[in-house]
Every structure is written in C-alpha cells, then in structure tokens.
C-alpha cells in the first residue's frame, strides 16, 4: 500500500509536496483504516483545486516516477531518448529550471508476511540520476536499514543489501541515466524486481485526456471474449448503476491485413419493452458515462485483485455524482476491497466533499499562487483564520465553495461580450 509520496521541482510544484495516506488519530470511519506492520493506512485520497492549479501534476509526478522505474534501463546508451523522458522542472525561475527533481515513496508490498515498510526514491537532473536509495524497516523496528544507496560519485555506491554476485553485476552494468531498481529487476535481483513490480501493478487513468478515453474504451476485461462467466460479472457490474444492459454479444471482426491483433464488435443487449426479446445496440452507441464505466472495469478488477493503487485524473468527467460515490464506496468497503487497494483521484465534484463519505485526512487541496507555484495540503492540517482546525461535523462542500479552505478559482465578470 502507498503510505506517502513526496516530490519536488516537478512542473508547477517548485517546493517539496507530500501526499500522505497514513491515517491520523482522527476517529471518523476508523473501520476503513488498514494496519500493515506499524503503519495505519487510508484507502483513498481525494484532491481538489481550481482549474490549472496543478492537481494533475500530482498524478503526472507519480506516473513519471512509475514509468522511469519501469523503463530507465532503456535510456542508458541513448541520450536522445533520455532527454525526451527527463522530468519537467519548475520553469519560472532559473535556479529551479536547471536543478534536479526528486521523487520518493513509502509503501508496503502486498502479500509480504513480514509486513516490512519500504522507502524508495531518486533525484534526477538533465544529465541523469544524481541520487537513489532504497531502505526497509521491519515490522518491529524503529529505524530503516539501507538496502542500497547511490550518490553522484563511484565511492558513494553502497549495495550492501544485495548478494555479492548481484553487486558485481550491477556495478558493471550501471549507467548514469539508469536506476538501480530497474537495472536490478532486469538482472533478476529479487528485491529490485519486487519494488519494480509494485510500481507496475498500479493503474493510471486520465479522463481529461481524449486519447486515454479512446484507448481505455478498447481494452476488454480479462477473459471477456471467451468466458461467459466474466461477461456475466460485467453485466452485474453494470447493474450497480444501470440495469438496462442484460447481456453482451461479441463478434470477431475479420482481419483487414494491416493488423495482426484480434478485434471484436461488442453489442449490448437490452430487453424489449413489448416482448421478451432483446434489442442489440453497439457498445459505442451507449452513453459516454456507460462507456467510461466499461473502460474502468478492467483497471478496477486488476487493482482490487492485486491490492494496488488506482490513480485517476478528473474522475468526475462525464459521470453522475451518485455514480462517482458508488465507485468510491467500492474502495471504502472492506468486504469488497479485501486486498486493500487504494484510489487517488483529482476531481471538481464537490458533492463528494462530505463528512458522510470522507475523513478529513483523505481530503486534499492544491492551490497555485501568483508566481505559478502549486502547494498541496490536507484538510486535516488546515487551520482557519481563528487558528482552529476543521471539525468533523463541518459542511466541507459549503465551506470549500465559499473559499474557507482556499484552492478555488479567483473569478471576474466576463465583460468582453458587453456591447459598447
């Protein structure tokens, strides 16, 4: 499970930002808090803020970190590729524009009976990796122990947490643009592979991006084509928000000679109102919301099975607030979410900003100042003008919209359409 994500000098975040999913001592919804080792962890983080405040950059930062962990060994001997994949720093001051960016996570691994906590991170600049570290902490330990540490010079390389044979292989193959974690995973070093696999298991969906919507809508659930039981599960999934779809009919489309991949035509079956027959409607003709929920199913299925993290940008796009709430309740119900999956999402849907749904430490805000610098903060840490913290019985939605918590747009009348 993700405990904490820290990043610095990435896009609009010049200074270090911390997204913390560790549970505070607040008492509301205590039954949803998951205990792993010595950590108490939350299943959800909801991120609010004005348009262009930098909310999506939190999503982008974790996606960047995950992508680099997965594939950094591809850039070791190709500087042009590395240049394309370098993180974008804060560009509005010359110092930050040329400085390194940093990314760090604290997390636990699913199925780890020892219930260790891991701390992994790296710093990267225009030349390559300047620092990288992996630490681990046993369930009963107070301090982290070093698995490896890497600095800028050769004498700042500590691989003491690896077997001797693995150390030699890594030292020989390591290049400046390559992370030890992704190189070690490629070399089948167990600890490195486990960490890389944790990143790979997490899912990302940007519903503000039409390309994401296009490609996700074409991803079919695992076993959907050949397994009628899987199709029935998808029907039951749809029944939680739309009972009109009773079944699916799947037809393989003949190859056109240009592609080797199998493609399918999917029709949704609806019950006729004047008979017991079924009307077939191409899935692509269903509503945008229905298509989005169909696209979400494979990712949701995998996240719940693996106990991984689902990052979603603009979750509310084209979905009714009640449907969004029902989707979130999937993660908040321990009977459904038995593998402790988590969801981190950005949204403008203030109806979910409720003390009937979320804890104060599950609600986050992003605000951008006049210099273009974004700041991330939690409702649990927010202090009002009187110096008081937010009570759990407050109307979060109302207070947010009147500006009590900040992170709302500053609006002016649109006068340009006035007639002279």
Predicted ranges, named:
Residues 38-40, 46, 60-126:
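Conserved P-loop NTP-binding catalytic core
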Residues 8, 212-285, 396, 404-405, ...:
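Extended helical coiled-coil dimerization/tether regions that scaffold
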Residues 2-64:
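Pre-Walker A-like glycine/lysine-rich segment at the N-terminus of P-loop NTPase domains
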Residues 7, 105-113, 136-138, 270-275, ...:
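Short acidic, glycine-rich loop/turn motifs
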Residues 4, 326-420:
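C-terminal lobe/lid and adjacent interdomain/linker elements of RecA-like ASCE P-loop ATPase modules
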Residues 44-48, 257-301, 309, 315-322:
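Conserved ABC ATPase signature
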Residues 10, 314-319, 350:
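Conserved Walker B
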Residues 115-253:
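Electropositive, glycine-dotted interaction segments
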């Amino acid at each position: 499970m993700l405990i904490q994500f820290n990043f610095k000098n990435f896009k609009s975040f010049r200074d270090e930002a911390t997204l913390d999913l560790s549970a505070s001592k607040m008492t509301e919804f205590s039954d949803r808090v998951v205990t792993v080792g010595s950590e108490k962890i939350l299943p959800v983080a909801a991120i609010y803020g004005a348009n262009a405040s930098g909310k999506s950059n939190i999503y982008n930062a974790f996606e960047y970190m995950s992508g680099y962990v997965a594939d950094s060994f591809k850039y070791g001997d190709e500087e042009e590729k590395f240049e394309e994949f370098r993180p974008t720093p804060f560009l509005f001051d010359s110092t930050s524009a040329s400085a390194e960016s940093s990314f760090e996570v604290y997390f636990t691994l699913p199925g780890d009976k020892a219930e260790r906590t891991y701390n992994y991170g790296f710093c990267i600049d225009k030349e390559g990796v300047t620092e990288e570290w992996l630490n681990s902490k046993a369930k009963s330990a107070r301090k982290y122990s070093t698995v490896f540490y890497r600095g800028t010079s050769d004498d700042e390389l500590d691989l003491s947490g690896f077997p001797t044979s693995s150390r030699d292989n890594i030292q020989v193959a390591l290049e400046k643009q390559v992370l030890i974690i992704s190189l070690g995973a490629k070399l089948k070093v167990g600890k490195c592979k486990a960490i890389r696999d944790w990143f790979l298991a997490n899912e990302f969906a940007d519903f503000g991006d039409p390309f994401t919507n296009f490609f996700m809508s074409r991803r079919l659930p695992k076993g959907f084509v050949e397994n009628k039981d899987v199709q029935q599960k998808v029907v039951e999934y749809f029944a939680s928000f739309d009972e009109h779809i009773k079944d699916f009919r799947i037809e393989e489309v003949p190859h056109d000679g240009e592609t080797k991949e199998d493609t399918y035509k999917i029709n949704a079956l609806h019950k006729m109102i004047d008979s017991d027959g079924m009307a077939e409607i191409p899935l692509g003709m269903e509503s945008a919301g229905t298509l989005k929920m169909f696209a979400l199913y494979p990712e949701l299925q995998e996240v719940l099975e693996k106990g991984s993290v689902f990052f979603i940008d603009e979750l509310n796009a084209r979905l009714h607030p009640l449907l969004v709430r029902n989707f979130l309740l999937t993660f908040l119900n321990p009977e459904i979410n038995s593998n402790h999956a988590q969801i981190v999402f950005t949204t403008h849907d203030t109806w979910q900003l409720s003390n009937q749904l979320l804890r104060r430490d599950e609600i986050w805000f992003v605000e951008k100042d006049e210099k273009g610098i974004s700041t991330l903060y939690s409702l649990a840490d927010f202090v009002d003008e009187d110096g008081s913290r937010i009570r759990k019985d407050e109307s979060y939605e109302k207070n947010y919209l009147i500006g009590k918590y900040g992170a709302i747009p500053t609006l002016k009348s649109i006068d340009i359409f006035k007639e002279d």
